[in-house]
């Protein structure tokens, strides 16, 4: 069987909702987005959004979604909260299965200002962001510009920290923690090392030995 459900924001699209070019977000954009991620999304997106078996427009600005069954009580929340709404007029002429570097048209509090593939991406705050006055967004999005720098690997990332390219780092590598944090900025106090116990469950962090190596052939070495 199927479960028919109305669930925000699909049963009601805020009339103020708009993309960065000023055009309104419509039900057609929502349905287009759903179809794109059902057919051309990642495997996980196809699996999740594929559970919406049919849709129909209801009322002035509503959308009714029929799900494959009512076993997954969280599914309507996932669809409502995580489905990216993309503009049909922009993406209908783009093959989303292929990589492209054009700055896309979005609707969020920030938009891409510039990008250098593999190096950096800059986001600029949208001054007239349509949802900035909603209670859920109060106190957020306070920076005019956000810059993400990309590093080739963890070694390069650590070296960038040592020379002051960024200010805060969480270290997960036990070997690196005990052997590489003796640089000048630590000695003169510019970098403060602090171990904090949080008592939260975390993933495994261990030293794994390859028992196929000759050095471990003697069982007494393994224990």
Protein language model regions, located:
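Aromatic- and charge-enriched surface segment that lines or borders ligand/interaction sites
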Residues: 1-43, 64, 157-160, 215-218
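Gly/Pro-rich hinge or "lid" segments in bacterial periplasmic/extracellular proteins
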Residues: 79-145, 155-156
């Amino acid at each position: 069987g199927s479960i028919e459900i109305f669930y925000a924001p699909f049963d009601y699209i805020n009339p103020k909702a708009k993309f960065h070019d000023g055009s309104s977000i419509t039900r057609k954009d929502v349905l287009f987005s759903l179809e794109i991620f059902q057919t051309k999304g990642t495997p996980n997106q196809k699996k999740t959004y594929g559970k919406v078996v049919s849709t129909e427009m209801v009322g002035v600005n509503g959308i009714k979604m029929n799900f494959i069954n009512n076993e997954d009580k969280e599914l309507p929340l996932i669809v409502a909260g995580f489905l990216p709404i993309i503009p049909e007029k922009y993406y209908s002429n783009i093959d989303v299965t292929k990589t492209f570097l054009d700055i896309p048209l979005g609707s969020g509090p920030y938009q891409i200002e510039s990008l250098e593939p593999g190096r950096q991406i800059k986001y600029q705050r949208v001054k007239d962001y349509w949802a900035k006055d909603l209670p859920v967004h109060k106190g957020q999005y306070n920076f005019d510009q956000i810059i993400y720098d990309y590093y080739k690997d963890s070694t390069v990332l650590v070296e960038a920290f040592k020379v002051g390219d960024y200010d805060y780092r969480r270290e997960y590598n036990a070997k690196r923690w005990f052997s590489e944090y003796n640089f000048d900025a630590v000695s003169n106090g510019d970098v403060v090392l602090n171990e904090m116990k949080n008592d939260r469950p975390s993933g495994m962090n261990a030293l794994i030995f390859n028992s196929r190596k000759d050095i471990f052939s003697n069982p007494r070495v393994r224990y």
